């Protein structure tokens, strides 16, 4: 069985100090869980915040520098997201995986720019997109030269200010790419607090259990030492102190469920 992928880190690059604190813990976990491939994630620009008054970040230059510090200090792989095509090249200098935001998952120029860098590309499936439509996204990336492609399930719009996860999407999307389950954004209530998104953190672990049982290739979890003080996604980030326990549970569930991943499909 391949290593299980865990993408984790604070939602936004609030400070270099925060990144190093979280990076130190993820490095420790990487030494404990040898069957897991860890990738450190944080965003230099939260470009689609609900309100103009919300914290966006410190910009590309600061972000790349801070992420490089984490990479050099702890030897962790790095991922971050881009929002415009011109950002692909400078981000590729530090990122091992380039992330495409859900709202931008169909933007052809952005996908091609990410693919052109030669880095792995992880596309968040839009909240508006059917799982079978991600095949077109993958074809665009392959056309651009991408060799390592991930698709991330992060919930589907379910009326106003709500998301629901349809776990059928995991085996559907696995037909053309490796599939990641986004455990923290999937429990968001988009715009649910008026000028910012809310969320239901208590459902992070129940839905992770389901995703691993169905058979995802990895999980994405935004994590923060003090989520209630986070400058973005305060309602859904996982407390850093709980990350280790969740990974232990993931591996136990995967060990049992993996025996049945390749069963004969019922038709």
UniProtKB/Swiss-Prot annotation:
Compartments annotated for it: namely:
Cytoplasm
Tell me its EC number(s), please: 2.5.1.55
| GO-annotated cellular components | cytosol
GO BP? keto-3-deoxy-D-manno-octulosonic acid biosynthetic process; monosaccharide biosynthetic process
- Report the catalytic activity: D-arabinose 5-phosphate + phosphoenolpyruvate + H2O = 3-deoxy-alpha-D-manno-2-octulosonate-8-phosphate + phosphate
- Pathway assigned in UniProt: Carbohydrate biosynthesis; 3-deoxy-D-manno-octulosonate biosynthesis; 3-deoxy-D-manno-octulosonate from D-ribulose 5-phosphate: step 2/3; Bacterial outer membrane biogenesis; lipopolysaccharide biosynthesis
Q: Which Pfam families match?
A: DAHP_synth_1 (PF00793)
Q: Which InterPro entries match?
A: Aldolase_TIM, DAHP1/KDSA, KDO8P_synthase
- What keyword terms does UniProt attach to this protein? Cytoplasm, Lipopolysaccharide biosynthesis, Transferase
The record's GO molecular-function terms, alphabetically, read: 3-deoxy-8-phosphooctulonate synthase activity
The answer on whether this UniProt entry bears the keyword Transferase reads: yes
Family statement drawn from the similarity comment of this UniProt entry: Belongs to the KdsA family.
Q: How does it assemble?
A: Oligomer.
Record HAMAP family: KDO8P_synth
Q: What is this protein called?
A: 2-dehydro-3-deoxyphosphooctonate aldolase
- Look up and give the organism this protein is from: Aquifex aeolicus (strain VF5)
List the top taxonomic levels of the source.
Bacteria, Pseudomonadati, Aquificota, Aquificia, Aquificales
